[in-house]
Design a protein with these regions (language model features):
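Membrane helical hairpin/interfacial module
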Residues: 67-92
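A contiguous, low-structure linker/loop signature
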Residues: 84-126
């Protein structure tokens, strides 16, 4: 991304909400205009620029051109993580032996690798430099960073799937959630492995690139847990990951329903929470807006992809209103940008932030 855009995002992400800007306060606050940021990746980018998804994954020059184009087309949007080298959900699970089905015009499907909890005992933390798709990502990052820099742009953030998301792909989502209750010890061992995997993969990306200042962790499965199960099976592992990257901007994405987990999530060490439209922005702001920055939460499919520009502006205005005029808000979708999202609706989001 452009340095100016990154510095603007980082400044807001790391700023400490002052007493005057806290929810419920009436004091004045000197603040910047609302920043627009969007998580974008292979479900949206190839279709938007008019190339097959397989070309996007396999032809590095097409990948570079596509990412440069969206940045130039929407100069006021901070795209996260920005120039994201990914293969759908496949990078981390592939290192555990998960097979993948590839499609011409959509991201690959991941097939679970283990079918009994007894198989967890044989799993080891993979080497990002050698196992699965991770080494390909690392090698490509070194290649593409030079091309990105020639465009006076920069790769400032890297991403990884969270420990529960990776575990659920290795085991199967339903099976993983059942294991939480029936085989808690084996499940915790799996989560220890996937937690260390996320840490090592993020560190490897940081080491292969030259300018990284932020991490993005994505894990929707966390929202499927009760508060009690969250504290046992998610909170320690999330906290371990975020605490491993001191000095980095830490963004967490979860667009499942997490209104029952807002307070403990805010204590994991994250700076920015991107959450779904199924959580009320005003409630989230009142409860944790004094601790973290909120990023959201326009309905993705119904409004950002399928609505009119006027509907996008209306929902954006509500997000701004519900956060006291945009205090602590990074205006965004309630999740990643979905397929078929038109340019006019992203333009409308930017216009709403401007006003």
């Amino acid at each position: 991304m452009k340095l100016e855009a990154w510095e603007r995002f980082k400044r807001i992400a790391l700023s400490q909400p002052s007493q005057e800007s806290s929810p419920g306060s009436k004091g004045p606050e000197k603040r910047e205009k609302v920043v627009t940021a969007l998580i974008v990746d292979s479900p949206w980018i190839p279709g938007f620029v008019g190339i097959p998804t397989l070309d996007y994954f396999t032809l590095s020059e097409e990948w570079i051109k596509a990412n440069i184009y969206i940045e130039e087309r929407f100069p006021e949007v901070v795209f996260l993580p920005g120039y994201w080298m990914e293969y759908g959900m496949g990078a981390e699970p592939s290192a555990f032996g998960c097979s993948m089905k590839w499609w011409k015009n959509s991201p690959p499907s991941v097939i679970p690798a283990i079918h009994e909890t007894s198989e967890i005992a044989r799993l080891k933390v993979p080497d990002p430099e050698a196992d699965g798709l991770m080494p390909l990502i690392l090698h490509l990052y070194e290649h593409i960073e030079k091309s990105v820099n020639k465009q006076k742009s920069h790769i400032k953030m890297v991403a990884a799937r969270g420990p529960l998301a990776t575990a659920a792909h290795i085991r199967g989502v339903t099976e993983f959630l059942v294991d939480l209750k029936l085989s808690p010890d084996e499940t915790k061992r799996l989560l220890e492995i996937t937690t260390e995997t996320a840490i090592r993969f993020l560190r490897a990306q940081i080491n292969h690139l030259s300018e990284v200042e932020g991490i993005l962790l994505l894990d929707d499965i966390v929202g499927f847990l009760s508060p009690r199960d969250y504290l046992e099976f998610a909170h320690p592992y999330m906290t371990e990951i975020f605490s491993s990257f001191e000095g980095m901007v830490k963004v967490y994405h979860n667009d499942s329903k997490i209104d029952h987990l807002l307070e403990p999530l805010a204590e994991t060490g994250l700076h920015v929470l991107n959450f779904g439209f199924n959580v009320d922005m005003e409630e989230a702001w009142q409860r944790v807006g004094h601790k973290i920055r909120l990023m959201g939460n326009i309905p993705t499919i119904e409004i950002l992809a399928g609505g009119t520009p006027e509907e996008v502006k209306l929902h954006a205005a509500e997000c701004i209103r519900k956060t006291g005029g945009g205090r602590g808000l990074i205006l965004s979708a309630g999740g990643a940008v979905p397929p078929d999202t038109p340019a006019r609706n992203i333009d409308a989001l930017v216009e709403a932030a401007r006003s």
